[in-house]
Amino acid sequence: MALETFVNSEPFTFGVELEIQVVNTHNYDLTKAASDLMRLIQGETFPGNITPEITESMIELSTGICHTHEQALGELHAIRDVLVKAADQLNVGLAGGGTHAFQQWSDRQIYDAPRFQYLSELYGYLAKQFTVFGQHVHIGCPDPDSALFLLHSMSRFIPHFIALSASSPFVQNVDTGFHSARLNSVFAFPLSGRAPFALTWHDFEEYFTKMVNTGVVNSMKDFYWDIRPKPGYGTIEVRVMDTPLSVDRAAAIACYIQTLARYLLIDRPLTLTEDDYLVYTFNRFEACRFGLEGTCVNPQTGERRTIAEDILDTLDRIAPHAAELGSRAALDEIGALAKARVNDASWLRTVFKQEKSLNETVRQQCLRWRE
């Protein structure tokens, strides 16, 4: 199969996708209600889209093409409200968070759709274990070479996105010690990690053709990279974030990525080399394990600083672009998180410490989602 033609899109437009937990209101375990939710929202009017995901305990919402923080926030609130109304009719709850705190993966039921059934047959139990919940952000790119430049430039900031969105400290009744345990599930897949270092679309097409010829992949969907190009949309897709506990946080993170993209493509502050990836896995691990307190290493200078410090420095550098995009309010929220060095994982641990119950913690997650 040939690689899709890259459809040039309006630079720095963006879209947000959020995978949501569907839980019962008895003990707040995951429940099988995605099909019923899809049935109830038929005929409802809302921006963007709502689609099923790989198991019956997940559902995905996505915005349309957004230009500003205000637009994204409005669309996310509108879609969220439609889903909450349907969930209330079914007496089920909805929650953000990258993992469910105590669900047992073996209880999951694969959603009845051809691609999901194919993935279940291919990956076995990994497909059910993949009941984890992420935020994806698409960024519009003017041409395919710019998309690849942005992809590799953005890779240096992957620890920021992980630490800011981290909301998965608990897995199967255990505090994992991680801020984002979700990404450990993603790493189990053979085509995860980072994209190959190709800076021209011609080189990327050659790589894709070789992979197709091996029989390992059929389409871009088979790559689970942290950032991947989406030729049919004319975007790059940043895929490392946990689903935050609120749509407000999701919008702020999306606009941080949008503003950073404008800075990277217009100012071109980075000279890209494959050596940029020498510390990629280390920095990624630090963000997953320690959140905003984690260490990140500059691959060119060797300088070490906390991820929170690196975010605050980055916010200063991209401030002029925030003014152009109307994203100052979003970046103020990001700055406040970095200064306080807290994220949703911190909040979840605080609730559990107070309540001594993961069931109650998930109940409060559901309340956060409605705010």
UniProtKB/Swiss-Prot annotation:
GO MF annotations, alphabetized: ATP binding; glutamate-cysteine ligase activity
InterPro entries, sorted: GCL_type2/YbdK_subfam, GCS2, Gln_synth/guanido_kin_cat_dom, YbdK
Gene3D superfamilies from the UniProt entry: 3.30.590.20
UniProt superkingdom: Bacteria
E.C. number: 6.3.2.2
Family indicated by similarity: Belongs to the glutamate--cysteine ligase type 2 family. YbdK subfamily.
Protein name: Putative glutamate--cysteine ligase 2
Organismal lineage: Bacteria, Pseudomonadati, Pseudomonadota, Betaproteobacteria, Burkholderiales
